[in-house]
UniProtKB/Swiss-Prot annotation:
Name the UniProt record assigns to this protein: Cysteine desulfurase IscS
UniProt function note: Master enzyme that delivers sulfur to a number of partners involved in Fe-S cluster assembly, tRNA modification or cofactor biosynthesis. Catalyzes the removal of elemental sulfur atoms from cysteine to produce alanine. Functions as a sulfur delivery protein for Fe-S cluster synthesis onto IscU, an Fe-S scaffold assembly protein, as well as other S acceptor proteins.
GO CC term (a single one): L-cysteine desulfurase complex
Record gene name: iscS
Modified residues (N6-(pyridoxal phosphate)lysine): 206
Length: 404
């Protein structure tokens, strides 16, 4: 067992050895290193063929047409291209966008940018279980609403939004629907023939592919138009210029191929580990699971340990690689905005830890983690005067704290 134990799969995954092996064949002189846009010689043709194969592998996971896949540098760029691209192209029809308060920063900050450009954005509050209410969404829709952006699976709490129902609603109102599927692709089945979703952001490194590569699914029927955000040689049918990184694209394709093949196996494996971890900590006092437990991917468990400071718990769990909040926001010491949106108070939001596991996590590692968590929480609570007061039956909300 290698320490520290990696339990932060929602931040990134190790590259699957099968993926790494494939990628190496597309870089050096004895490999296929050509530019896929070089049309005049075999080096280019072979690289283009490799890209086409990967495009098909990615499309297959979504049951899409390969021509609907546009390569980007990752889900952040895909979110930017989808939201800015659609909002700008359709701005004559209206300048109102709807999203939720628990979206990834790549969606929220892109929407903030649109607001600076004169768009109006409605940020929906989720229910306390993290799910978006359809009636609230419908109530927010207006005649000038051009875009709705709701993520499939939340990166902090793992809840699965009902994008099928949301898609039906958007289509009936002729509103473009964008879904950030960085955390769901390869974990939950996505079928674009069934789902009325127009734009889907995808990432490779969340499903055992390389970092720095992603894609945007852009529906052809009914056709969705976007304004390009990256200008240049007109690559990717003009949606996204820039030389295609063949080795990364091949890696993403292989990762998606394996994900489709192993989806059920990976799912059951994660579920067994999640239940094992949950069973190991649920008898502890003052422990809360954040987010709906049923409508959720099994790869994620977000737990609040009351009366323990999240940062000090992270430090005490030095042999576990876990996070409080998401990797993208843990650089700031603010409590998680996702947990705040669920209605958790600052203290509880600050005392939460996200455990996320995956293909290479073992039962032995989970058992070790349980032991570490129990010891660390007990030790920190022993040092906490608040814990003593709680144990004495004092309602901490009624205490008048002296201000220094």
């Amino acid at each position: 067992m290698k320490l520290p134990i990696y339990l932060d799969y929602s931040a990134t995954c190790p590259v699957d050895p099968r993926v790494a092996e494939k990628m190496v064949q597309y870089m050096t002189m004895d490999g296929t290193f050509g530019n896929p846009a070089s049309r005049s010689h075999r080096y280019g043709w072979q690289a283009e063929e490799a890209v086409d194969t990967a495009r098909e592998q990615i499309a297959e996971l979504l049951n899409a047409d390969p021509r609907e896949i546009v390569f980007t540098s990752g889900a952040t760029e895909s979110d930017n291209l989808a939201i800015k691209g659609a909002a700008h192209f359709y701005s004559k029809q209206g300048k109102h966008v709807i999203t939720s308060k628990t979206e990834h920063k790549a969606v929220l900050d892109t929407c903030r940018q649109l607001e600076r450009e004169g768009f109006e954005v409605t940020y929906l509050e989720p229910e306390s279980n993290g799910l978006i209410s359809l009636s609230k969404l419908e109530a927010a829709m207006r005649d000038d609403t051009v875009l709705v952006s709701i993520m499939h699976v939340n990166n902090e709490i793992g809840v699965i939004q009902d994008i099928e129902a949301i898609g039906e609603l958007c289509r009936s109102r002729k509103i473009i629907f964008h879904v950030d599927a960085a955390q769901s692709a390869g974990k939950v089945a996505i079928d674009v023939q069934k789902l009325k979703v127009d734009l889907i952001s995808l990432s490779a490194h969340k499903i055992y592919g390389p970092k720095g590569i992603g894609a945007l699914y852009v529906r052809r029927k009914p056709r969705i138009r976007l304004e390009a955000q990256m200008h240049g040689g007109g690559h990717e049918r003009g949606f996204r210029s820039g030389t295609l990184p063949t080795h990364q694209i091949v890696g993403m394709g292989e990762a998606f191929r394996i994900a489709k093949l192993d989806m059920e196996k990976d799912y059951q494996h994660a579920l067994a580990l999640r239940n094992r971890l949950l069973d190991g900590v649920k008898d502890m006092e003052a422990v809360t699971i954040n987010g709906d437990l049923d409508q959720r991917v099994p790869h994620n468990l977000n737990i609040s340990f009351a009366f323990v400071e999240g940062e000090s718990l992270l430090m005490s769990l030095k042999d576990l690689a876990v996070s409080s909040g998401s990797a993208c926001t843990s650089a700031s010491l603010e409590p998680s905005y996702v947990l705040r949106a669920l209605g958790l108070n600052d203290e509880l939001a600050h005392s939460s830890i996200r455990f996320s596991f995956g293909r290479f996590t073992t039962e032995e590692e989970i058992d070790y983690a349980i032991e570490q968590i129990r010891v660390a929480v007990e030790k920190l609570r022993d040092m906490s005067p608040l814990w003593d007061m709680y144990k004495d039956g004092i309602d901490l909300n009624t205490v008048e704290w002296a201000h220094h």
